[in-house]
Amino acid sequence: LFLSAYTIHNMILKENKNLLNLLYEKFHFDKRGEFKDGESPTVFEPIFEYKEGRLRFRYLRNYIDAGHDVQNQPLSKSQKEALALLDNLTRDENIILRYDLKPGDMVFSDNHWILHGRTGFEDHDDENLKRQMLRTWVKDRT
């Protein structure tokens, strides 16, 4: 499953600019226990931002809910409304690209603006036939 953050951004812009503006404000994202002593258990970042002229998108609703709980900073009614709109758009079948990967297929995507996911699958019992996936990050040095 693939979905463009630009598409979501522009749909929210058309539907409710005030809610889009809220998504440019910072939210607490839970670090899921991956922090050192003395560090914050959350990252405080916006969902949408433009960085170096490019749209960047970060969103995991459960990380935001947990992050605000950890920081004891409840989400406002308008923040919840903005996140609900975002949740609905990320499930909109009209804007999701579905692609059935075949053995040997390779996918490259930019995690800063392409949302990605997968549907459920049943794996083989035979170790030689089990699903294999190699995930790597390629850094753009420009």
Regions found by a protein language model. Name each.
Residues 1-103, 108-142:
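Active-site environment of non-heme Fe oxygenases that use a 2-His-1-carboxylate facial triad
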